[in-house]
């Protein structure tokens, strides 16, 4: 509540007019968790990025019950498969149930189409080299999506729906 009030004063607007993404960004900058992922510590350079991507729903976490604790994991070391990507809400790309690993060549083409950048520009920005044999981790995919497409910059309402 304090963060929202401070942002309202800073932006000169009513509390109800403070943007959700502004609240989330302020909380991240203060070191807060938006999602309870255990993959990375707050000190990790990829922490904020993973939180942003998780909030968009483009990559989903899994929950695990360990003893009396509920845990959430983004499985950042796992190989990205097509079924992992939920691009429909943000980009109109239908979800695939395929369990096939995403090849880096396919991923670069996908990002190229979504960003309207040439494949070589996608590679230059993300560092992902296209290959028919090479796959990528969920962490590398999240990094590339965050860096190139910036989905967290799209505003949402208080229910999480895109505006």
Positions of the model-derived regions?
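Short amphipathic C-terminal alpha-helix that caps PH/PH-like domains
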Residues: 2-5, 27, 145
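Acidic, Ser/Thr/Pro/Gly-enriched interdomain connector segments
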Residues: 31-56, 62-68, 109
């Amino acid at each position: 509540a304090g963060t929202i009030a401070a942002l309202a004063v800073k932006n000169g607007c009513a509390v109800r007019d403070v943007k959700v993404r502004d609240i989330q960004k302020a909380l991240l900058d203060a070191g807060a968790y938006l999602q309870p992922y255990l993959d990375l510590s707050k000190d990790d350079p990829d922490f904020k990025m993973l939180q942003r991507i998780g909030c968009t729903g483009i990559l989903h976490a899994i929950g695990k019950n360990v003893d009396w604790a509920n845990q959430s994991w983004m499985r950042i070391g796992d190989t990205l498969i097509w079924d992992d990507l939920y691009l429909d809400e943000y980009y109109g790309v239908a979800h695939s149930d395929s369990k096939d690993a995403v090849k880096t060549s396919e991923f670069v083409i996908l990002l190229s189409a979504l960003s309207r950048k040439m494949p070589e520009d996608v590679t230059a920005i993300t560092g992902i080299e296209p290959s028919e044999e090479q796959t990528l981790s969920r962490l590398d995919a999240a990094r590339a999506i965050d860096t190139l497409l910036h989905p967290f910059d799209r505003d949402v309402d208080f229910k999480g729906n895109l505006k």
